[in-house]
Structure formats: C-alpha cells, structure tokens
From Swiss-Prot:
Residues 85-369 form the FERM domain. This is Band 4.1-like protein 4B. It comes from Homo sapiens (Human). It is found in: Cytoplasm; Cell junction, Tight junction. Up-regulates the activity of the Rho guanine nucleotide exchange factor ARHGEF18. Involved in the regulation of the circumferential actomyosin belt in epithelial cells. Promotes cellular adhesion, migration and motility in vitro and may play a role in wound healing. May have a role in mediating cytoskeletal changes associated with steroid-induced cell differentiation. The lineage of its organism: Eukaryota, Metazoa, Chordata, Craniata, Vertebrata. May be negatively regulated by phosphorylation. One of its GO terms (cellular component) is cytosol. It comes from the Eukaryota. One of its GO terms (biological process) is positive regulation of cell adhesion. Keywords: Cell junction, Cytoplasm, Phosphoprotein, Tight junction. Its main location: cytoplasm. The gene is EPB41L4B. Residues 413-424, 502-517 have a biased composition (Basic residues). Expressed at higher levels in acute wounds than chronic wounds with increased expression in healing wounds, especially at the leading wound edge. Isoform 1 is highly expressed in brain. Isoform 2 is highly expressed in testis with lower levels in prostate and breast. PROSITE patterns: FERM_2, FERM_3.
Amino acid sequence: MLRFLRRTFGRRSMQRYARGAAGRGAAGLGDERDGGPRGGPAAAASSSALPAAPGGSVFPAGGGPLLTGGAAVHISAAGAAKATLYCRVFLLDGTEVSVDLPKHAKGQDLFDQIVYHLDLVETDYFGLQFLDSAQVAHWLDHAKPIKKQMKIGPAYALHFRVKYYSSEPNNLREEFTRYLFVLQLRHDILSGKLKCPYETAVELAALCLQAELGECELPEHTPELVSEFRFIPNQTEAMEFDIFQRWKECRGKSPAQAELSYLNKAKWLEMYGVDMHVVRGRDGCEYSLGLTPTGILIFEGANKIGLFFWPKITKMDFKKSKLTLVVVEDDDQGREQEHTFVFRLDSARTCKHLWKCAVEHHAFFRLRTPGNSKSNRSDFIRLGSRFRFSGRTEYQATHGSRLRRTSTFERKPSKRYPSRRHSTFKASNPVIAAQLCSKTNPEVHNYQPQYHPNIHPSQPRWHPHSPNVSYPLPSPVLSSSDRLPFGIEENGGTPFLTAASGRHHHQHQHQHQHQHHSNYSLSLTLENKEGPLRSPNSSSKSLTKLSPGTPALFSEAAAHLKKLELETVKAAGPWPPLHININKAEEKKVSEKTLQTPLLPSPVADHVKCNILKAQLENASRVNIQGGKEESPFVNINKKSSLQDASVRSPIPIRVETAQPAVEKPEIKPPRVRKLTRQYSFDEDDLPPDLAEAVGVTTSTTTNTTTAATQVSVPLPSPKVQNVSSPHKSEGKGLLSPGAKSPSDRGGAFTLEPGDLLMDFTEATPLAEPASNPHCAHSRCSPPLSLPMKEETTGVCMYPPIKTRLIKTFPVDTMNPFPDTFTTGPQFTADFRDSKLQCCPGPTSPLIPAATLRPLTETVSTVQTIYTTRKPVSLAASAETLRQELEREKMMKRLLMTEL
C-alpha cells in the first residue's frame, strides 16, 4: 500500500508524469513507461551532448579529448528486464561505451561490464567516477545500487579512471595496465592537476612520441610534428623544439619500454598519485588535504606544511561537515602525545566523501587483506557510517594475480591539432622564432638568447647556441671559414671558439693569450670575465661590446674597429706585426714578442718609463762599450725572451747627455715585503715554511769579496728592519753596497748580449747579502733558500732535478753612486748525473765527464708580468753604471725566481 502511494503521489512520480504530458503535447513522445525513449526527452537530449568530466568541464583543461577514441560501443546487459538503466562510460582513450543494465543494478555490475570490454586483468587500481549536482567528484561504490548513488540521470555519465596510483609502477605486470596508467598521467598533466618541472615535462613528452610514433626519422619528422600534439596546458614553441631534440635521444626504445620509462620518471613527481581535497581550518583559511600511499599531506596554497603518516593517525571521523584527525607524535622526551586537527568542508556529503576516500587509501596501501566487512551488531542499533573497504589491497593485487600468456591490445593515436603557422618561419629563422615564442610564455626558459642584429641582413646569420636542426634549411649552412666574420658575440659573452679562431699560444711555462690580426677575423680572449674590459682612457669606448643599432656591413664594422684600435694604441706607439711561429722551427725575433694585448694597451706608468729610459740609454751607449764579456761554462744558444723590445716600448727618444747623476737625490724606496708577496702571489701572513724561515735570517756582513765559498741568501725583511744605506755610508763602514764594484774587478769591462737588457723587472726585490754557509741549490734541500757558489764542491742534491737558468757573474763596482738592492751573484750552473742535481758555480767537477753534462739553459724560461706602483728614479750618470745596475738586477731576479 505504501509503495503504491509513493509511486502514485510521490514528487518524483509527479515530475515524471508532467514531463510525459509535455512531451506528448509537443512531439508526441512520452516517458519510457509510456512507450517513449529511455529517460524521456531529457535523456535523449543528454545522450547527444558530451558529459561533464570530474574536473568540472567536458574534458580536461587543455582542450578536447587526449586521444581520438573509437566508435561508440553499445553493450546490452539488461537481459529480459523491462526497466533498464542507460549508462555512458568514457574510457581513457576517449572511447564512449554505452551500457544497458537492469534497474536495480549495482556499481559492481557496471564495472564488470567495462572491465570485460577492455579485457583488463589488474582491475584493483581503477574505478568509475561521476559528478554530483555540486560538481564534486565521487567514486562509484560497487556495493550500492547505481540509482541511489547518482542523482543526475538517466542517462548516467561516468568516467573510467585510475583510482589508486601504484607506488611502484614496476609492479604492474600487464603492459596494457601500464599503458592505461600512462594515459591517466597524460590527462593529469594536460589538465594541470599534476604539476611537473619543465625538464621533466619535456622528457615525458619525448617518451610519449617515442611510444606512439617510434623512431625519430630526421628527414620525415620535424619540429612542426611536435606542435600537433598537446602535452601541457601552456605549450610553447620553444618547448616543442626541446621535445624534438629529446625525442631523438630516445632512439631504440620500444613502446613498452618507453611507457615504463615514462612511469618511472613520473613516479618521482611531488604530486604523483595525490588525491587533493579542499578544506577549511579553524581560522577560516583554505587548506588542501592530499591522500597519498604514505599518509595525508597538508598544503597551504602551494606550500606543503605537514605530513601525517598512516601509522600515526589513530582516529579519523566526521560529523556533518566537520572532519576530525587525531595524530600521535613523540615529544622531546620521547613520550607520545595526541594532537587533534579539525577541518570543515562545504557540506556533509563532501565531508563524508573525503572520509571515505581516506579510509580506502589507508586500507589499499597499508593492509595486506581487508578487514571483516560484516559486523556482529545489528544495523538498527549501529551508529555512524556503515561504509567499509570491500576491494582487494595493493599487496593482494601484486602477489595474488595470475599472468596471462598472451594479451593483445591496440594503442589509440593521440588527437592531432593544426601545426603552428609560423613553424616554417621558425625553420628558416630559428633564432627569431625562439624569441617570439619566449615572449608569449615567460615561464618557459629560452633555448636561445635574444638576437640583436648588428650584421647586414644579406649576411648569413649565426648564433653561438644555434640548435642542431635536422630538417633542411632554405639558407646555406655556414662553414668554419664563413663563420669567421662573426667571431665576436653581440651580447658580450664568450666568443664562438672553433679550431680556426681562439688559438692559445703557449710560451715557456705560462699561457699567454695574444690578439690575432687578420683581414677577416677578430677574436677577443679576455681573462677578466666579471665585466667588460675598457681602454685606459675614460673617454674610449669598450671594445668587447658592439653597438646593436643600425646594421652595417662587416667591412664597415672592421674599419670602425681598426679606427678604435688606432686611437687607443696611439698613446703607446706603433706595435709591430705579430709573427706566429707555426712550424716551431724558426726562432721568433725579439721585437715581435709581447706580453700585452695590442687592442687593450695600458698607459705607460712613471716607473715603467724609468726602465724604458734605462734600456734606451744602454742601447745608445752600447757602441761606446769596450772590452770583453765574461762567459760562463755553458753558453745559452737558444736564448729567448718574451718581453717586447725596448725600442718599441719607448714612446719618446731619449738623449744620453740629459742624464744627471743620482747622488744629489738619494732614492727613497718603498717597503718591499708587500711588493715581494704581491709579486710572487704569497700571503704576508701565510708564507711557505722555507720562505718564512728565510725572513728571520739576519743578513751577515763581510769585507772579503774574494772568499772561496760565497752564499747568496734571500731574506724578506719587514719594513721596520729594512735599511737602505747610501753608498757613502757603506764605504765608510767597509761594506760593499749592492751596486758597488770590487777593486779587483773594477777594470774589467764586459759587453752584453742583444737580449740581456730586455727583461723589464720594475718590481723591487729584497736585499741579498753574502753569507758563508754553503747549501744546496734549491729550497728542497735546505731551509735557508740559499745557493752555493763554491768553486770546488762535490755536494750532490738527493732530490730529482729541477729546471733552472744559467746565472752569470758580474764584477762589482764600489764607485757606483746608485744604491742597489742586489748583491753580487757568482756564476751558477747545474749538472745532471744519475737523476740527481749537482750544483757547482765554477768549472765542472773532474769527477763528472764533460760529455754527460746537459746544460739546463735549454729549457724554456718563465716570464711573469709584474705590475707595481714603484716611484720613478732619476737617470743614471753614465751608461756604464746603468748597464751594470740593470744587469745585476736581472741576474738577481733570475736567481730569486729559480729559488722560489
């Protein structure tokens, strides 16, 4: 009786008959019970339209279905029942399946029909999802009737989706299951639900192309093909080019291997498999609860602020629209304390749905077998929800399923979109096209920097990061010789270095980078990469950055550069053409070698001018010098110098007659400890042990200059104890000043070789006075850093041989009015015997045959450019004294370099 009254006078019944009357009056159609179509006119209208997806739109954001899908499939499973349910299910590949079920069919019946149609074995990871009137997504409960769960219909629209994302995709045994997982992840990324970094998105898209299209064939496949696919919501042309480049690296992978690589890459994403639900806290702010295999994540906006592991959650219940979580955490003392968190949702139905999803996630990922679903208590006196997890767990799905021998399935092609209109334009102008696409989407990085045209359009374009495009270009490809005119990068970065440009010449033991002059190339190799180098004059323009204004021909640009070069070099005088010794057979001329870049000259400092004057004074007086020159036992045949000729470096001619004696103005020399430490890159507070010990050695004085054993030590006096005595005081005390000459050697004049005075050492050097202790020649044998100069010695160094230079001895002049910081240096030679170094200053030892001696002067010398701020000194009174002073200075500089 109650059923009759409900069926006759119920609200649903009255609405149904009202629709039937309206349909009969309008089109002659009635309800399905009156012989009309299933669901009446509303159902007929809804069957022609696409259903809404769980995300709130017809399809995921990003436009249209992911795959093309197939023809609509109809499954009649109602049997002989008169009343049927009409359900429409949309699969992951875009196929629509319509199913007729009995009136009281449950969710399990519909799910079994879909699984049977797909021929799917691992069914525990999937489910059917639908939307309610509030556009909230719900999972179809397999244990309840469909009509009681879905209030919108008929027809009932559902979506077949992945419900539980496997924590380890390698546990998925079926290839078809992995294929469905890939389709689901592609849906999530395209809709924006699953966020992934740029590089990861590029790699995943390349794997999709490899799985669907196979190998990347360069003549057939182009970047235009990638633009026909959709992988992320905001897909740019720059990203498509990167996908194409990555696709070429996936060569050799089968579709199954590419899909497995896709899953193994996607499982490391932060939001992989996270089921997000929006809630509100007690403060009224919105939060997001994410259900994962390990626990519940809490997000505030995009920031993760908490994680509750499943073992730590002791209680989770709901009451109306309020969800309560009780979490156990250990305090500082190791005691467990309970913390209660309360969240609110929009409605009681939404709150219950979140609670059910949390229970299912916990049971599927944490339990081995589901608990007993039947309760001992009666349903009449039971409080709360009767929902219990009824499916299989992940452990059962992984260990309990059987493998099929064979299984076949068809991979549906992805939906294609029209390619970009300017893809052909990008092929001919890749740099400009990259700039255009980077402006449209600033979030995606540019695979090429912006292009500043400073070359005439008729010239072929070049860029240092030009991609290796495989498709044919309409413009000719630049060869290595054609690319030479574009050796300078417009944006001031590193130049394009090839085998033809950017050569580095290695002279001696240091790398000196020279500037190459040619008619067609100009390559700047600057050591200072922190900022552009500018010319010394403040008014001169920078040479490392060209003006990106009006395009000009390269000839005009070369003329402009040459003009700037002449303007900047004008202050330093003309530079000789650089001679490049390619065959290494001919010796370079002295005047053709330089340590400075011709395009970037530095202004001539005062202290440099002083040394230049000295060198020119010596050249002017060389013709007046008489006498022989003291020769050493070993003659340096291949003597080389990396410094520039003094005649070239000197800006103005100097007359010898203008020199005045320097006795009237004694030189005041600055402290030398800091200069020495700066010269040899030593720290004043952290010197090497040998050098630190040499600092403390007190200099001994002697009046006998003809002793048999003479030792030259190199102390580093501090400014407090440094004493520079004038020549008059040194003569009064019986001491020989560094620039003095011995009475026995006063009459012996000597000449210089052509390159002797070309060593430009403007940096001051510490005092070196004679001592009496003989030691080995290098610092590894004795702490005091001394050089033995004994005439007859048989001391053999027990260490491996080292490279050294031949040091010549020069007489000392006591009448020299200039105070010199260097003492007399006896002759120094080094011989090899049995891989040991023997130091002997004079003639060779009779124990060692002359045939076994190998002069060390054949080794390439080391030249170091020294920049100082030494004050200029006055000119010498005569050319003879200047020459002697420079010669001794050069000799002691070599001695110090050999020791250090």
